[in-house]
Design a protein with these regions (language model features):
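A short alpha/beta connector and helix-capping loop motif
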Residues: 30, 48-81
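Acidic-leg catalytic submotif of subtilisin-like serine proteases
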Residues: 33-43
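Active-site-adjacent betaalpha module
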Residues: 1-33, 67-72, 83, 89, ...
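Short acidic/His/Gly/Ser-rich catalytic and metal-binding motifs that mark active-site loops
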Residues: 42-45, 87-88
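Glycine-rich, phosphate-binding/catalytic loops in enzymes
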Residues: 50-54, 94-95, 177-178
Length: 234
């Protein structure tokens, strides 16, 4: 698992600017969605096109957050990347990666194939949301209908988990924030290839775009933000 602590001098600057470390000190759980980005075989399996070795370590935290989000009355959304052919994304697949890398990604992310499937240790449920995207961001309206679906369910807060921290998770989180969703990246619910890339993304995000919380902190927020009637019934 990546380290999740920020240097004290960085936290001091946050407090100087914001008056506190965390942007969102409370959430309304019924208006909250846990968004799980690209936890697919393509990014979790050994030798897959986008393998992130640490991604598999996220599974216990993601499953816990999914259970807690459902129990609190929120929405769980599973986002899967999909590609059909290189012509669907020419600037990236024809220019920014080698041809053999592009072919590997298209092969692994073809809907119906093994690479496109969710990692088998995850615990999705039938009533969860399942959406597909064809760009890095799940909150780019031309690439994914997730923003519209969440708005229709009166969601105003999103919790971002998945992989890669500094690519699809970050792109999704930034676009969510720019679309006026209160956005929290989960520090031990995202993974990438290096600690440096992971922490750099989280530092920028909490400083400018939204908030960063651990899974344990997020569980506490979800429980505290439950409707009183739901909490009393339990």
């Amino acid at each position: 698992m990546h380290p999740t602590d920020f240097p004290q001098d960085f936290l001091d600057r946050l407090v100087q600017r914001r008056g506190r470390v965390h942007g969102f000190e409370a959430i309304e759980s019924r208006k909250t969605a846990l968004v799980i980005v690209d936890m697919q075989n393509c990014f979790c399996a050994a030798g897959a096109a986008g393998e992130v070795p640490l991604a598999k370590e996220l599974v216990p935290n993601i499953n816990l957050l999914a259970r807690e989000t459902r129990a609190a009355g929120g929405v769980v959304a599973w986002v899967q990347s999909a590609l059909y052919k290189k012509e669907d994304w020419p600037v990236f697949l024809d220019t920014l990666v080698k041809p053999e890398v592009a072919d590997h990604f298209v092969s692994d992310l073809m809907p119906g194939g093994e690479g496109h499937k969710l990692w088998p240790s995850l615990e999705p449920e039938t009533n969860d949301l399942f959406v597909t995207k064809n760009r890095f961001s799940a909150f780019l309206p031309s690439a994914c209908n997730l923003p519209q679906v969440l708005r229709e369910r009166s969601i105003d807060t999103v919790l971002i988990t998945g992989t890669l921290t500094n690519v699809c998770s970050e792109s999704s989180a930034r676009d969510a924030a720019m679309s006026d969703f209160k956005t929290i990246m989960i520090s031990d619910g995202n993974a990438t290839r290096t600690d440096e890339d992971h922490l750099a993304t989280l530092r920028t995000f909490i400083a400018v775009f939204g908030d960063v919380r651990t899974s344990a902190e997020t569980v506490a927020l979800l429980r505290a933000g439950r409707p009183k009637m739901l909490s009393a019934a339990e």
